[in-house]
Amino acid sequence: MAEHDDGDLIAAIRGLARANVLVVGDLMLDRYAYGRVERISPEAPVPILTVTREIAMPGGAGNVVRNLTALDAAAAFVSVVGDDQEGSDLTALIGGQPNVEPWLLVETGRATTVKTRYIAAGQHLIRADRELVMPLTDKLGERLLKIASDAMAATSVTVLSDYRKGVLAPTIARNLIASARSIGRTVIVDPKGADWSHYAEADVITPNRRELAEAVGRDLPDEAAIVGAAREVIGRFGFGAVLCTRSEDGMSLVTVDTVRHYPAEAAEVYDVSGAGDTVVAVLAAGLASGLPLEIAARLSNIAGGLVVGKVGTAVARPDDLVDAVKPASGALRKVVTRQAAAEAAERWRQRGWRIGFTNGCFDLLHPGHVHLLEQARAGCDRLVVGLNADSSVRRLKGATRPVQPEAARAAVLASLASVDLVVIFEEDTPLDLLSAIRPDVLVKGADYTHDTVVGAREVESWGGRVMLAELLPGHSTTATVTRLRS
């Protein structure tokens, strides 16, 4: 496959859904508390965060699994949680992931690792960790090894995601690698610590620059130093390849006789949380779907660049990767999926921007539509337009509508300067889309009343408001269609 062939790369991305990957490693609960800072505490010179929203998601090895499912790949997941509420929360969160076969063992007396990040205006204020690092009991370790070794038979790639919380003790890591090699399975290790001897014979190891420097005991100031260090650990531990992530400098893939440097793909960096997990997941899915190592590494580099441009522990989806390889041109860049719109809204929110939302069929765009959209945009910093899909319009307007198909309606809307994003939705109402975007301002025409605006109660529940825009008399899509037919 030629690296420059966009068509082949897009086919490779679509093929990631064929992957079936085993993930073994440390699972933790990632919590995010978002809010605003408006004053300093009178008790100490520290900011007061007024929390407005909290979310929780699987972290550590669980984030590798999240990224695999975001690619539509299948995953078997083996890990350990404590017998506490956080462990129960993680079990539910992992159980809610599609295409995952979870094997979460519960250990009495173990405290589930929890990392809580406090964020305001897109900036991390502090991270609070609660953890008790301890090895597994011999009995539980043997059980984990048996389950993981059995799961290897149904998967083609095994990922060891080591955060040094006790699941991947040296003996367990060695035995898992030996089991995988005995049946011809590829092993990827995301390492931790300075001693990598228990990762010996892994096919690919994925350190960042700091971790590789720690393993060889010296600074790595440039590409030549990174290549030298990578070949040193390849020679010492028998690795097939080292994929070193280098932050703003991209990634380097090193084998005994080849070197490839991939430049950084990120346009803007908002949050590096979990980016390494994304790289590992895409690499694993690529290899599991039959891609050459060089192409899988290239896709993982693209994916890493995407997630650092998002807020929080984010994932890269196939459509994201396709757009990065072959971006839409012109106004069509504004036509996005619900998930992409929600992620954009979160970035805008962290910058303190007010998000506006309106929706409709916008079948034959007329001056009345333009007037409403301009008022909506004047009442916010960024405007998202929900556009009824063709099926939704037919249910609402009848079998003869829409006149224009959804792709054409979306393209015309996206060409307007007042519109920042367009999202097509299949439902009869935009409630689900509203809940995903959580706008500050919900805009409808003045022919509505507050009580008849769908989503008014929901928007006001999170502190938003409803705006009724004045209408421009004499303009109606229905009237235009009637005139055309007569």
Curated annotation (Swiss-Prot):
Its EC number is 2.7.1.167, 2.7.7.70. One of its GO terms (cellular component) is cytosol. Pfam families: CTP_transf_like, PfkB. Keywords: ATP-binding, Carbohydrate metabolism, Kinase, Multifunctional enzyme, Nucleotide-binding, Nucleotidyltransferase, Transferase. This is Bifunctional protein HldE. InterPro entries: Bifunc_HldE (IPR023030), Cyt_trans-like (IPR004821), PfkB_dom (IPR011611), RfaE_dom_I (IPR011913), RfaE_dom_II (IPR011914), Ribokinase-like (IPR029056), Rossmann-like_a/b/a_fold (IPR014729). The active site is at residue 277. One of its GO terms (biological process) is ADP-L-glycero-beta-D-manno-heptose biosynthetic process. It is an enzyme of class 2 (transferase). GO terms for molecular function: ATP binding; heptose 7-phosphate kinase activity; heptose-1-phosphate adenylyltransferase activity; phosphotransferase activity, alcohol group as acceptor. In the N-terminal section; belongs to the carbohydrate kinase PfkB family. In the C-terminal section; belongs to the cytidylyltransferase family. ATP binds at residues 208-211. Residues 357-486 are annotated as: Cytidylyltransferase. Catalyzes the ADP transfer from ATP to D-glycero-beta-D-manno-heptose 1-phosphate, yielding ADP-D-glycero-beta-D-manno-heptose. Homodimer. The gene is hldE. Transmembrane segments: none annotated. It comes from Acidiphilium cryptum (strain JF-5). Pathway: Nucleotide-sugar biosynthesis; ADP-L-glycero-beta-D-manno-heptose biosynthesis; ADP-L-glycero-beta-D-manno-heptose from D-glycero-beta-D-manno-heptose 7-phosphate: step 1/4; Nucleotide-sugar biosynthesis; ADP-L-glycero-beta-D-manno-heptose biosynthesis; ADP-L-glycero-beta-D-manno-heptose from D-glycero-beta-D-manno-heptose 7-phosphate: step 3/4. It catalyses: D-glycero-beta-D-manno-heptose 7-phosphate + ATP = D-glycero-beta-D-manno-heptose 1,7-bisphosphate + ADP + H(+); D-glycero-beta-D-manno-heptose 1-phosphate + ATP + H(+) = ADP-D-glycero-beta-D-manno-heptose + diphosphate. Residues 1-331 are annotated as: Ribokinase.
